[in-house]
Amino acid sequence: TDTRHRVTNWTLEKNKATDRPSNTIQLPDWNYNGVSQVTGTSNTFVGTSFVELLRQNGYHTIHCGKAHFGSIDTPGENPTHWGFEVNIAGHAAGGLATYLSEQNYGHTRDGKPYSLMAIPGLEDYWGTGIFATEALTREAIKALDKAKKYNQPFYLYMAHYAIHVPVDKDMRFFPKYIKKGLSDKEAAYASLIEGMDKSLGDLMNWLEKNDEADNTAVSYT
């Protein structure tokens, strides 16, 4: 629980708590650097990831999407430090600058992030018109295709940045909800939800097509 590991709020920058100032309560010195598998960083909960245990027992381990395990420049920020052999677009941030490839998911034209929330690792999709949710899904399927060749069990942790602000419009689905009479904001929110639904369906279809559906446990939380 949060009270055991003392990561009681969202994390981002190293050694910086994200609490709002309060004149009425004394804020605790919580673990605002997040979690890690190694010692040496203050205000960090140290523990062993179950993903590391899976890796040690022969699983090929894949992370795709939001990580948000540890603050920037701490060991915990990188999913590969948690037993993941493959990391797709995971870093310290728990949010995102934008879902839009037209804005390079938070990067300038010369490739520099203009926000700490810029999504890394999706350069191949910049400027393509592909929404971040779809880009992550495609990359996850590519990783599964590779995993299929390794002749070992696999673990995919699919952690979409959706649903999270900014509530960008996924134009694959947005017009449908406008036609249903929803406001722009409501329709945009609904489009984020349907994008996640499609992603789950695509992954389930991969399991079916590759004869893995009856041999795979799927947990949706």
Kindly give the residue locations of the regions a language model identified.
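Catalytic-adjacent loop/helix segments of enzymes that bind and process anionic phosphate/sulfate esters
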Residues: 93, 97, 121-158
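Catalytic metal-binding/acid-base residues of hydrolase active sites
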Residues: 4, 67-68, 93, 161
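Conserved small/polar residues in nucleotide/adenosyl-binding loops
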Residues: 220-221
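Active-site neighborhood of glycoside hydrolase catalytic domains
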Residues: 195-206
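Active-site segment of extracytoplasmic enzymes that catalyze sulfate/phosphate-ester chemistry
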Residues: 1-49, 53, 59, 73, ...
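Aromatic- and acidic-residue-enriched segments that line the glycan-binding/catalytic groove
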Residues: 73-89, 166-180
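Active-site His/acidic residue clusters
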Residues: 140-188
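The substrate-binding groove and active-site-proximal loops of carbohydrate-active enzymes
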Residues: 34-42, 122-134, 183-195
